């Protein structure tokens, strides 16, 4: 979606983003791969998704109309641009094609908007990339002859070339990957209260990982996410064992799991993360990654997995030095 006062960079946004999402190489950057390939790699070939792209379309107003913050610090009416985008494709798209579970509702609708996002260099009047549901906005769930739309997500087109730079480049696929992952049911792994909970840092695309490689090389999903999605079966360790030749995540290695025998909702996950494949931009961090999980369902439902306002963090890296922070990353 373009705005009345902001258009996409370049003169071929459709083909650029079709390449980024579907065909393997970003036209302007020759980076790692497409979002389609990302999900193929994460799911061991199970989740083979193609992205149908429509547009660009132009919104009725300038970007500030949709992105301006309210008194609570959040965007006031970003849902309006979703409504306008859906109006632009009405009658051109069969929404039932995107209804994966047969409930009459398109499961994911994603909007890419022109310019910067508030989370990565844009000012307060730009839209913050997010996933949400239209039932929370004044428009409510939208109904069309071929189906309903409720869940949507959005992300920005551009980012600063370097921190604080006024030179802007394509935002890559990292933020799209993160927000689309919310559509699939994955929760944030950073401290959603804005506190000092350290979460999963660069090792998780639901934390800082979508920004790896300047957004062009989002890291692999963690063992928790791949297990949660049903894409990998962990190997249980229930007695002392010697593990050799542990394959890396990028080489489709299976993670190991060790349960608390008194509470199977608490466990440790172990996986080999090497600077290869989608993990090649882990800033030199490689080796055995151990994650401590305290599975409290409400923390995932409320998107507060690693909130510092809670007594414990529920899915965090176990540091080799025993510290409770990763400020050196």
Task: Give residue ranges: language-model regions.
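N-terminal module-boundary/linker segments of secreted carbohydrate-active enzymes
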Residues: 1-25
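Extracytoplasmic/secreted proteins, especially bacterial periplasmic and envelope-associated proteins
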Residues: 12, 16, 34, 77-84, ...
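Short intrinsically disordered coil segments
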Residues: 13-16, 220-227, 287, 305-309
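Acidic-aromatic substrate-binding/catalytic surfaces of carbohydrate-active enzymes
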Residues: 14, 21-24, 29, 301-307, ...
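Active-site-proximal segments of metallohydrolase catalytic domains
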Residues: 29-148
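Extracellular hydrolytic enzyme modules, especially secreted metalloproteases
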Residues: 32, 36, 108-110, 114-285, ...
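Intrinsic-disorder/low-complexity accessory segments
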Residues: 278-329
């Amino acid at each position: 979606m373009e705005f009345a006062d902001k258009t996409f960079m370049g003169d071929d946004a459709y083909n650029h983003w079709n390449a980024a999402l579907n065909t393997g190489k970003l036209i302007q950057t020759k980076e790692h791969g497409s979002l389609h390939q990302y999900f193929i790699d994460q799911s061991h070939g199970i989740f083979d998704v193609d992205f149908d792209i429509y547009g660009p379309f132009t919104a009725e107003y300038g970007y500030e109309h949709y992105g301006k913050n309210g008194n609570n610090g959040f965007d006031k009416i970003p849902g309006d641009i979703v409504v306008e985008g859906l109006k632009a494709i009405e009658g051109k798209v069969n929404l039932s094609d995107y209804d994966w579970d047969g409930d009459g509702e398109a499961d994911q609708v994603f909007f890419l908007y022109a310019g910067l996002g508030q989370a990565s260099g844009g000012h307060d009047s730009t839209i913050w990339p997010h996933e949400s549901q239209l039932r929370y906005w004044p428009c409510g769930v939208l109904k069309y002859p071929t189906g309903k739309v409720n869940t949507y997500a959005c992300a920005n087109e551009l980012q600063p070339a370097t921190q604080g730079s006024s030179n802007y480049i394509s935002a890559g696929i990292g933020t799209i990957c993160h927000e689309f992952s919310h559509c699939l049911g994955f929760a944030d792994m950073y401290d959603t209260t804005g506190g000092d909970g350290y979460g999963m840092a660069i090792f998780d695309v639901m934390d800082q990982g979508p920004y790896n490689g300047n957004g062009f090389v989002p890291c692999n999903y963690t063992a928790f996410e791949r297990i949660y999605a049903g894409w990998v079966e962990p190997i249980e360790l229930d007695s002392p064992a010697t593990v050799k030749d542990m394959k890396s995540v990028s080489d489709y290695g299976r993670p190991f799991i060790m349960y608390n025998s008194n509470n199977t909702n608490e466990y440790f996950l172990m996986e080999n993360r090497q600077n290869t494949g989608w993990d090649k931009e882990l800033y030199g961090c490689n080796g055995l990654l151990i994650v401590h999980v305290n599975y409290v369902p409400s923390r995932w439902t409320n998107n507060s997995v690693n909130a510092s306002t809670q007594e414990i963090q529920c899915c965090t890296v176990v540091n080799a030095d025993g510290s409770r922070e990763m400020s050196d990353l």
